[in-house]
From Swiss-Prot:
This is 2,3-bisphosphoglycerate-independent phosphoglycerate mutase. The lineage of its organism: Bacteria, Bacillati, Bacillota, Bacilli, Bacillales. It catalyses: (2R)-2-phosphoglycerate = (2R)-3-phosphoglycerate. The keyword Isomerase applies. The gene is gpmI. It comes from Bacillus velezensis (strain DSM 23117 / BGSC 10A6 / LMG 26770 / FZB42). GO terms for molecular function: manganese ion binding; phosphoglycerate mutase activity. Belongs to the BPG-independent phosphoglycerate mutase family.
Length: 511
C-alpha cells in the first residue's frame, strides 16, 4: 500500500532578509524553493532569542533549533535557565553552589571559579561568573580564585581585554576574587583528545606552571605582541610580587566550572576529577578530592556535582509518532546527523520503535567551501529511494550545506551550496507530493543570509533573522508569529495525530 508521507525538511542555516548584499540565500538561483514558496501557504518563523529559549537577541544554533523543533515547545537553554535563576534569586539559593562554598569555608580551602571569559553565550556567560563572585562574597569567602579561559571565537578574536577589564571592575566592586591563571580556549577547552593542549592548561591551574605574569592584562599584551590572539593564548600563571603564583588548585579545594555547554568542558573536568585518568601524567601531587561543581551535566565520566540538572523532555515528536505506531525516518549527512537524531529526540541516543536512521558520510575535505554541495546529492538519492519504497509515514531530513558552507563567510561557495540543496529539495519534495504526501520546508536558524559584515569583513556566525516555513498543502493558511516549537505540532497535524499536552507549541495550520 502506498504511504502518504509527511516530511519535515530542515535547510540548515537558511535565514531570510530583504537586503541582498552578502546574502547567499537571496543571490542563489533556487527555482524549486521559489516555486513552493509561490505555490503553497508560507510564513516566517522566529528562530532566535526567547522564542527558542535563548536570551533576547541571541542567535539560534543547530542544537537549540532541533531541540525546540523536536520538542514542540520552547526548550529553555542552559544560558536562559541560569539567567532566569539569577533574575529570580534561585541562583543564590542553589544548594550545589552553597555546598561547594560550605566545603571551602568549613575546611579553610579555596574556591576556584573557572570557565570561558566572554559574553558569547555559546559555552558560557561572564555574568554567571559575576553572580558566583557575589554569592561567594555574601557567604563570607575570601579565598576565591578565577582561572579565565579566553574566547576569541564566539566573540571577536581580540576582545579579551574588554572582558578582563569587566572582571577587574566587578572584583573591585564586589570585594572578592583574584585572577590566578589565564589560558586560550584552544588549550583549556579542547574536545578532540589533544591532551598535550589540555595538559598545559591543567599545569597552569594545578601547579602554577607556565609563563608567568603580574596581571591578566600583561598576558594578553605579551600574546598580542607575539601575534597570538585570544583563543590561542598559552596557559599562563599570574604571580604575586614575590614571584609565587597567586593560587594553585590544592587537595580538597572547591571548584565551580561555570561553562554550561558540555562538549568542550568534559576533557579538562575529567583531568581534575577522574581517579583513573590516564591521558597524560598528572604528576604525584595532582590535586585530589576536589569538591567539583559543573554548572550543568557535562558527562557521566565527570566525577562531580551538577548545579543545574538536566530537564527531561517527554513526548518529543519521535516518541509521539512511535506511540501511534507510525514509521519514521531520520536522514542527514554526518555534520547534522546528531541534530536529526539525538537533539530532535530531546537528547535521547536510542531509536524509538519504528524509527529508522540513515547516515550519509560528509565529504572528507579541509573546509566545506572546497565542496559546497557536500553530500546533499547522496542524501537526496538515498531518500528518494526510501520514498519510493513506501516504508515511512514521517520523514525528518536535514540539508547541512547553507550552514556548514556559510560558516566560511564566503559568498560564492555558499551560493553554490544553496543551489545544490535547491536541486535536491525539488526532487525530494516532488517525490513526496507524487505519493500524495506533504512537506514542511523550513530552517533551524539563519547563517547564509549574512556573509559580509557592515565593515566588509567575512561574517561567519549565525544570524537572528527569521526562517521560512512552507507547507505543501493546498487550501490551508498558515498563521503568523510562529516559532520552531510549532513545527512538530504541524507535522503531527498533517498526519492526523493529536499533539500531547507537553507540546505547548501549536500547529501553524489555521483551522
Amino acid at each position: 500500500m502506498s504511504k502518504k508521507p509527511a516530511a519535515l525538511i530542515i535547510l540548515d542555516g537558511f535565514g531570510l532578509r530583504n537586503e541582498t548584499v552578502g546574502n547567499a540565500v537571496a543571490q542563489a538561483k533556487k527555482p524549486n524553493f521559489d516555486r513552493y514558496w509561490n505555490q503553497y501557504p508560507h510564513q516566517t518563523l522566529t528562530a532566535s532569542g526567547e522564542a527558542v529559549g535563548l536570551p533576547e537577541g541571541q542567535m539560534g544554533n543547530s542544537e537549540v533549533g532541533h531541540l525546540n523543533i523536536g520538542a514542540g515547545r520552547i526548550v529553555y537553554q542552559s544560558l536562559t535557565r541560569v539567567n532566569v535563576a539569577i533574575r529570580e534569586g534561585e541562583f543564590e539559593r542553589n544548594q550545589t553552589f552553597l555546598d561547594a562554598i560550605k566545603n571551602a569555608k568549613d575546611n579553610d580551602k579555596a574556591l576556584h571559579l573557572f570557565g570561558l571569559l566572554s559574553d558569547g553565550g555559546v559555552h558560557s556567560h561572564i555574568n554567571h561568573l559575576f553572580a558566583l563572585l557575589k554569592l561567594a562574597k555574601s557567604e563570607g569567602l575570601t579565598k576565591v580564585y578565577i582561572h579565565g579561559f579566553l574566547d576569541g571565537r564566539d566573540v571577536g578574536p581580540q576582545t579579551a581585554k574588554t572582558y578582563i577589564q569587566q572582571l577587574n571592575e566587578q572584583v573591585e566592586e564586589i570585594g572578592v576574587g583574584e585572577i590566578a591563571s589565564i589560558s586560550g580556549r584552544y588549550y583549556s577547552m579542547d574536545r578532540d583528545k589533544r591532551w598535550d593542549r589540555v595538559e598545559k592548561a591543567y599545569r597552569a591551574m594545578a601547579y602554577g606552571e607556565g609563563p608567568s605574569y603580574r596581571s591578566a592584562m600583561d598576558v594578553v599584551d605579551d600574546s598580542y605582541a607575539n601575534g597570538i590572539h585570544d583563543e590561542f593564548v598559552i596557559p599562563s600563571v599570574i604571580t604575586k610580587e614575590n614571584g609565587e603564583p597567586v593560587a594553585k588548585i590544592h587537595d580538597g579545594d572547591s571548584v565551580i566550572f561555570y561553562n554550561f555547554r558540555p562538549d568542550r568542558a568534559i576533557q579538562i573536568s575529567n583531568t581534575f576529577t577522574n581517579k583513573d585518568f590516564r591521558d597524560f601524567d598528572r604528576g604525584e601531587n595532582h590535586p585530589k578530592n576536589l569538591y567539583f561543581v559543573c554548572l550543568t551535566h557535562f558527562s557521566e565520566s565527570v566525577d562531580g556535582y551538577v548545579a543545574f540538572k538536566p530537564v527531561n523532555l517527554d513526548n518529543t515528536v519521535g516518541e509521539v509518532l512511535a506511540q501511534h505506531g507510525l514509521k519514521q525516518l531520520r536522514i542527514a549527512e554526518t555534520e547534522k546527523y546528531p541534530h536529526v537524531t539525538f537533539f530532535m529526540s530531546g537528547g535521547r541516543e536510542e531509536e524509538f520503535p519504528g524509527e529508522e536512521r540513515i547516515l550519509i558520510n560528509s565529504p572528507k575535505v579541509a573546509t566545506y567551501d572546497l565542496k559546497p554541495e557536500m553530500s546533499a546529492y547522496e542524501v537526496k538519492d538515498a531518500l528518494v529511494k526510501e520514498i519510493a519504497a513506501d516504508k515511512h509515514d514521517a520523514i525528518i531530513l536535514n540539508f547541512a550545506n547553507p550552514d556548514m558552507v556559510g560558516h566560511s563567510g564566503m559568498v560564492e561557495p555558499t551560493i553554490k551550496a544553496i543551489e545544490a540543496v535547491d536541486e535536491c529539495l525539488g526532487e525530494v519534495v516532488d517525490a513526496i507530493i507524487a505519493k500524495g504526501g506533504h512537506a514542511i520546508i523550513t530552517a533551524d536558524h539563519g547563517n547564509a543570509d549574512i556573509l559580509i559584515t557592515e565593515t566588509g569583513e567575512p561574517h561567519t556566525a549565525h544570524t537572528t533573522n527569521p526562517v521560512p516555513v512552507i507547507v505543501t498543502k493546498e487550501g490551508v493558511t498558515l498563521r503568523e508569529g510562529g516559532i520552531l516549537g510549532d513545527l512538530a505540532p504541524t507535522l503531527l497535524d498533517l498526519l492526523g495525530v493529536e499533539k500531547p499536552k507537553e507540546m505547548t507549541g501549536t500547529s501553524l495550520i489555521q483551522k
